[in-house]
Amino acid sequence: MARGFTVGFDPLGLGELSSGSLSSVSSRGHLGSDSGSTATRYLLRKQQRLLNGPSRGIRASSPMGRVILINSPIEANSDESDIIHAVRVEKSPSGRLGFSVRGGSEHGLGIFVSKVEEGSSAERAGLCVGDKITEVNGLSLESTTMGSAVRLLTSSSCLHMMVRRMGRVPGIKFSKEKTTWVDVVNRRLVVEKCSSTPSDRSSEDGVRRIVHLYTTSDDFCLGFNIRGGKEFGLGIYVSKVDHGGLAEENGIKVGDQVLAANGVRFDDISHSQAVEVLKGQTHIMLTIKETGRYPAYKEMVSEYCWLDRLSNGVLQQLSPASESSSSVSSYASSAPCSSGSLPSDRMDVCLGPEEPTSHGPGWGRADTAMQTEPDLDSRVETWCSVRPTVILRDTAIRSDGPSSTRHLDSALSESPKTALLLALSRPRTPITRSQSHLTLWEEKKQRKKEKSGSSGEKGALQRSKTLMNLFFKGGRQGRPAGDGHREAWTLDSRSPTKVRPRLDLEKAGSVGPVQKFVTWRLRRDRERGRALLSARSGSPSGQAPTVNEQVQAWESRRPLIQDLARRLLTDDEVLAVTRHCSRYVHEGGVEDLVRPLLAILDRPTKLLLLRDIRSVVAPTDLGRFDSMVMPVELEAFEALKSRAVGPSALRPTRQDTPPKRHLITPVPDSRGGFYLLPVNSSEDEDGEIREKLGVLKVSLGASAPHHKGIPPLQDVPVDAFSLRRGACAPPPQPPPVAPRPPRPNWLLTEPLSREDTQQNQSQTPAQSCSRSRSRSRSRSHSRGQGKSPGRRRSPSPAPIATAATANGRYHRPRKARPLLPRLLDGQVAKVGARQGPLENGRIAEEAVGNVSTGALRTITLSKMKQSLGISISGGIESKVQPMVKIEKIFPGGAAFLCGDLQAGFELVAVDGESLEQVTHQRAVDTIRRAYRNKAREPMELVVRVPGPGLLPLASDLRVVKDQSLAPDCPSALGPVDDARILTQLPPPEARQLQQSLSSALKVPQSIPKLSPILKDPHDPS
């Protein structure tokens, strides 16, 4: 004992312990000495436990002396867990860490390193299989789930980890359901480690006998309780015997097993069927076997074991002697359990990754095959309950009514096992019969009968009020009872104004939920009755309120009800509600009040008025009023609740707002419906959704059950998260299906080129300002608030057309429209401008309706993608763009993968339903409904491709300027197009349009190239 020892402890891992220091530092612990220092090591550990307290688990003593280990740590007896190392792991250039982890708080474990790749950065840093990661970058991983640990490990490129060199990896294996039995002889709990019952193992040991029980139909009471059944995998056992009952007189004891009853075998029968057999006849012949125990509860437990790391890195299950021996058994400390009566029968479960062949043969063998041979030694494995404890039903066979099934009181603060032990330690109390709660009037009546001493009434059964009487008679104060008194209200002799309920349930001992509900209902009715009786100074009796009192109460509540009604209803509806309430107060009839109110209050928000109207209803009519109104109020509450948490509804576009843009992306919500994603959140949510899906994939893989209801352990590769997260940024671009034509509205979004910049520098400041203002308005699609550039007086003979004239409608100069790429519409508006505002609008509408602006084309696309992926704009309510057009196509959607749809196409029809002359909201709903209908595949879109009647774009004008409009050079609008356009217009207008087109092609150098060139109407020539 006097021999010295040294302590080798390296918390930061700064120094490695050499193999030559084995004399001072043990290979399996932080204490080092020779073989004679066992007592010293034991004393030091005991002193450390006294100073620091229980470090890995809390041991609590039960009332019967049983020791329970809480938190079930599986590394409780491991000496290597105190060796702490600091490891610094950096990601490789490819972004890999090179190790996998296992465990998590969802399994009651820490985070363990289960695999380390050869040549990886983790192996070079010194990370080993079997290390328990306790800290990462200053954050503790104790009591951390696997998902949180993986997110923390992949969040940084450099990991500073504190690990415990355990040298082993936790495995998991599952046992069958364990049944806890109550030993009647020794009054203790015995845990059975296999699914077979003691009667099955020792069927010949018990003494069998036949018992005859005779009862009558009037007084059917066998006097015992049964427990068990086929649904629990057990037989039928006697769990309780009434003191002095029929069963006790015939020798039936607690712990006897019922093998048969009247020829019906009970070895394979459910609990409810056994109750029916025992309560079916007056003469019952029971076959009884003495077992001395009955089942208490069942639970599913999981047993953890260790996988040891060999010298070559392969995991192998430890021997029984080296496994953890932390006791979590619920055996009593004095419960003898021989190996012959309770053999160990465990079930082998294969655990491992989803693809065992992806690793080497050693890994696949170690993770998927764990040999769990039954062992009869004194080995107690670490286990924890993974399912809630099932308390077996206990049914009393003693009455002709419904079977009274009782459970243990779940309100106790102790666990079910401790509650059972406390119940076993208490002395047995004889069975006493108690009647239901009686009213005060019935108690007085019963005392009068007892005082009268009538022999004929003493033996009769006194029945108390039933639940039906309490609900439908006790709650109505105006109905008289049998002797003429009011049943629900009575007067206190000491206080004439104090009204108290008849049902004084608090004095009757234990109060159940039904009695509490009845008491609460009576108190509520009493408070409402007092509110109606508050106008009176005092009353000698507790009668129902009169008509005058109801009128006074209505007049006091009328301003509040009318104020709330004006907020929710129209003026006519407010008058109607007031009229019906006044009629009810003066004439009565709750049905005549409820029916018109429900017809008026046809919206969920309007039904909120019923809460205030309920205060006007008389207490005698509240039951009928609630029965008629309550279902409607519940539906309204559900509707308001779903509306509060649901997506915001799309409202129709106003007349003074620009066209709306909506991303047609039907995404299912939690209620099975669909809603649209915002336009600006598609790219942001794409990465978030992929990241969430990645996390879900790992969590689902980690919790994929290999056994019913049991989550097994799996290795989670850390690099899979980092690689998946890095791959989410650039979405793959599919190859183009066909060469796409230039976008029709690219003039609005194309930046200025070098030639444009040079030209802007050479022009006058007024011209540059005019061009910049027109471009800014075209890009933002907003209405002009100041003066339009097209209305400025210019020395050139041709003014600049605005969106007001380009769309064929006449507006004042201060309300100019942004530019639209339509030369033909501008010419028609120019022609009609000479005939006045009214004729201008009519002629422009006729021209736009007659002239075809593009060819129709049918495009089909698949509905297999989750999102259609387009943004639309326009609608019949918009003056700028009455047609529905595709504003933008988003990558990844069905429209993008189709390859035929382009931004600027006009949508004519979707799946046979027309989109012409419809509102913006109607178009959104139509497209969403068509894409959601997966029965019609594929989706057919009829679009109008923009024709050649567009404005010359920037590139076209630049070509015209460079070539100086050579006479032999064909223009953007060829002769064929001019002839086609002119044949569709009236002859006078065609001639004017032809002159305008010919003059428009002669573009002077001083005119801005981005504006259409028209003939000046003020030119005298």
Curated annotation (Swiss-Prot):
Comp. bias (Basic residues): 772-794
Tissue: Isoform 1 is expressed in developing and adult cochlea but not retina. Isoform 2 is expressed in developing and adult cochlea and retina. Isoform 3 is expressed in adult cochlea and retina. Isoform 4 is expressed in retina and developing cochlea but not adult cochlea. Isoform 5 is expressed in adult cochlea but not in developing cochlea or retina.
A single GO BP: inner ear receptor cell differentiation
Domain called PDZ: residue spans: 86-156, 210-279, 858-930
UniProt feature, compositional bias: Polar residues: 758-767
Cross-referenced PROSITE patterns: PDZ
Any single Gene Ontology cellular-component annotation: stereocilia ankle link complex
Disordered: region residues: 324-345, 431-495, 724-814, 992-1021
Subcellular location: Cell projection, Cilium; Nucleus; Cell projection, Stereocilium
Keywords, in A-Z order: Cell projection, Cilium, Nucleus, Repeat
Residue stretches of biased makeup (Pro residues): 729-744
Superkingdom to which the source organism belongs: Eukaryota
Primary localization: other
Pfam families assigned to the protein according to its UniProt record, in alphabetical order: PDZ (PF00595)
Disruption phenotype: Mutant mice exhibit congenital profound deafness and normal vestibular function. They show disorganized stereocilia bundles with a reduction in mechanotransduction currents and sensitivity in cochlear outer cells. Knockout mice have normal vision function from rod and cone photoreceptors.
Record GO terms (molecular function): identical protein binding
Bias (Low complexity): 324-344, 799-808
PANTHER family named in the record: PDZ DOMAIN CONTAINING WHIRLIN AND HARMONIN-RELATED, PDZ DOMAIN-CONTAINING PROTEIN 7
Summary of subunit composition and partner proteins: Homodimerizes (via PDZ2 domain). Component of USH2 complex, composed of ADGRV1, PDZD7, USH2A and WHRN. Interacts (via PDZ domains) with WHRN; the interaction is direct. Interacts with USH1G. Interacts with ADGRV1 (via the cytoplasmic region). Interacts with USH2A (via the cytoplasmic region). Interacts with MYO7A (via MyTH4-FERM domains).
Primary role: In cochlear developing hair cells, essential in organizing the USH2 complex at stereocilia ankle links. Blocks inhibition of adenylate cyclase activity mediated by ADGRV1.
Protein name: PDZ domain-containing protein 7
Source species: Mus musculus
Lineage start: Eukaryota, Metazoa, Chordata, Craniata, Vertebrata
Gene this chain is encoded by: Pdzd7
